[in-house]
Amino acid sequence: MTKILLLGLGRWGANHLRNLNNLPVELFVAEVGDKQLEPARKLGLSAQRLTTNYKNFIGKVDGVVIVTPAQTHFPLCKEFLEAGKDVFVEKPLTLANEESKVLAEIAAKHKRILQVGHILRFDPATLWLRDAVQNGEFGRVNMIRGHFGGFKRPRNDSGVMFADGIHFVDLFNFILGALPKSVTAIHHDFFGRGMDDVSFVSLEYDTPRGKTWATVETEYFIPGKFREVIICGDKLSAVCDYNVAQYKIKTYANTHTPAGGKDFKANEGVVTQIETPPEEPLLAELRAFIDSIKTRATPRADAQSGYDAVRVLNAALESVKTGRAVELK
């Protein structure tokens, strides 16, 4: 049985614990303090599988799931990869471009799995959208809009763009099968913490079917919970609500046709509700990580995708500082 170390039992780490406990793995858990290990004890994990010093278990496990603050990702991933362990790390892979690049290189050198927690890649709705876009059902995708926000407690290890905006940045890269050529962003720091709590990111993609303009809005203030993506093509459009378990997607066969001169006619088409399997994405991505450990297959959310997302976000930070569009290097 595959031996997995879960490193971190914070808010999101507790969800990893619940899902890993339901998978066919021998689970070990590490946290900085004994009190933080209580959720693992309540699930029945023995004292021999719990520690406040993760180094005690490095030699005992096949892989590690790292759910710790973003600033710790680089040193922890590096340590485990160089120790010959496969690694799943929550997004972002790192906060700095160079660190993400180094981790990808270390994973390749040591022939280790490095999977990044880009969870939306494992949502059945995402796979439907990607396939429909790639198969041409939308025609030319003119624009994509994403809003990942709502009133909640802010994270303190990064701004809202790195905490939440990264979900839709990676999602758009995945759906379009491309990276943006140009990035523009505006941030606000209403809390005065020295990090963004409102973020607007504009991305310009070149795809085989033409240019696509995408926007990602994230914040901590608007009442409610928003996980919405809208894709507008010249043949088909779709609204996807990631808050919904099964019926996330509605498609609209809306088109515009020339009506002479500068006039266009707006044609409202059939609205279709798309049903996708009600699979929990976190469980799916953890299962995929365990499968990759066994088969050595490249993960769907591999080190390169993690590096690419970090590059886009750092281009956005540069745009915020300079007030200009930044070409992705």
Can you describe what each PLM-predicted range is?
Residues 163-248, 283-295:
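Contiguous beta-strand/loop segments that form the cofactor/metal-binding neighborhood of enzyme cores
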Residues 83-85, 110-112, 209-212:
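A short helix->loop->beta-strand "cap" motif at the edges of active sites that frequently abuts
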Residues 43, 56, 63-66, 112, ...:
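C-terminal helix-rich "cap/oligomerization" subdomain common to oxidoreductases
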Residues 117-124, 150-180, 196-197, 305-306:
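Mid-domain beta-loop-alpha active-site segment that forms a flexible
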Residues 94-153:
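A contiguous active-site-proximal alpha/beta segment in oxidoreductase catalytic domains
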Residues 119, 234-304:
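C-terminal glycine/acidic-rich active-site capping loop/insertion
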Residues 1-45:
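N-terminal Rossmann-like dinucleotide-binding module
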Residues 39, 48-106:
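Beta-loop-alpha module in the N-terminal Rossmann-like domain of NAD(P)-dependent dehydrogenases
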